[in-house]
Amino acid sequence: MYLKIDEFNSIDEIPDYYNFTRPYVIRGGCKSMKIFSEKDKLQFFYKHLSKNEFNTEIYNTFTEMESTDVKNYVSQPFSKTYNNILTGSIPHNYIADMDLLDCDMHSKLKEYFTYNMDTKRSNNGILLFFGNNSRSGAHIHTGNDYILNQIYGKKTIYIFDFYDNPLQTFGIFSDRSNFLKDNIFQLDHSKLKIYKVVLNEGDSLTIPPWWWHAARAHDVSISITKTYARTSQLYLLKHPGIMLILFIEICEHYLDDLFYLSQHKEFIAIIILIIIYIVSYLYLK
């Protein structure tokens, strides 16, 4: 039923090191991180983050979580979220996309998540995902290359290329424009083109910006996803919808600072690509 993703033993072996073009599994890819020298990784996170306030997603049911239909966001101490997750209490608490670079962390703590690629590519995010049987709806990242690193527990990823399946998306002006409307977990996967991979502790998965993916954790799970700037944005020519989403996101984010916006290289790249796309379309037409 499921397609298989190619696997490697080292991130240095993948053929698209500087600009991801398809996902790859790196077995044991993140075991070089210092965090794996800790005997109790859960206690490590509790010790270093317990007093930090985190924006926590609150769900009443797993079905809500499968569609990333967040019922409430609560800013609360990590210690409170930690206790909810470890006991499997309801409502379900979930920390997702929490960038540790934005937290009040000692620089030495960040060293626990150093990845082999960090010396050759610009790492601009260290994202924490922490939950118990947590799920995430199918979505794309639109920009940057992502590497999902499974730190604790096990996680299953369902992933497919942008045009692989005729599924509905939210509108480009929606706050969920990078998500599918369909609950991927409740669809008949035998009728779809889907790659499936199970990540164990120490495994990594590379994710290009335009690949749809949904995740399901098995029991308590901690993932650290690292994001890397791309040197090429040409993929946007094949994905004009993503181009518009990025353009709108950047404009909304920097609307009050047009000068800064004009200096934003991704903004300039998108403008140039939009012009090229329109000219190419008119010429070919």
Range-by-range predicted roles:
Residues 1-204, 214-278, 282:
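N-terminal accessory scaffold of Fe(II)-dependent oxygenases
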